[in-house]
Amino acid sequence: MSSDDAQKLWKVYRTAKELVKDRGYTITDKEVNLSFDQFVSEMCDPMGKPIKKKMCFMASPSPEAIEKFPEMGNIWVEFCEEASVTVKTMRNFCIHISENKFATGILVYENNMTPSANRLIPSVAPATIDTFQETDLLVNITKHVLVPTHIKLSGAEKKFLLERYRLKESQLPRIQREDPVARYLGLRRGQIVKIIRRSETSGRYASYRICL
């Protein structure tokens, strides 16, 4: 593995930390801002090769997140040691999520995932599993200048919004679960996201979309 590979995984690791923090989990600025030298020192072998087992981490919801999303629970992030996710790899990951009572699991892999492995994901319900290819996390898409701010609403906020504007869920514009920002935030079916955009004429304005 070259130093370029280590650089790549360092970027992926930092974006994963940012993602977890943006979902409302307790991640320190020090973790998010880990330098490349620190990454090599803490996560790599003497030859500079990243040890993916060392990169795995768990996080707990922040007090603010628990207040807004009481059902949130802990999250586990795992970096797959195999290049591709097989049924065996996914089964072991599902067992780890279930046995340790994680509410959410994130599996980051290098190349691809077999359809059979993907079909195992619902087996951990009521826990949920999100999967990302390493290239998905090379950059944080939410920091792109053209991507507006997305904020996930709580159940209470959703109820208030629908009642205030006398709306039915079917009347709201939609955002697909496969949307890159929806995946980043971990949006689930039926959840609403508030999207804040800037306008040269009207300043900031908000719109809402429901995840399907």
UniProtKB/Swiss-Prot annotation:
Classification via InterPro entries: Arch_Rpo5/euc_Rpb5, RNA_pol_Rpb5_N, RNA_pol_Rpb5_N_sf, RNA_pol_subH/Rpb5_C, RNA_pol_subH/Rpb5_CS, RPB5-like_sf
| Record keywords | DNA-directed RNA polymerase, Nucleus, Transcription
One Gene Ontology cellular component: RNA polymerase III complex
- Domain of life (superkingdom): Eukaryota
Localization, per the record, is: Nucleus
Subunit comment:
Component of the RNA polymerase I (Pol I), RNA polymerase II (Pol II) and RNA polymerase III (Pol III) complexes consisting of at least 14, 12 and 17 subunits, respectively.
Protein name (record): DNA-directed RNA polymerases I, II, and III subunit RPABC1
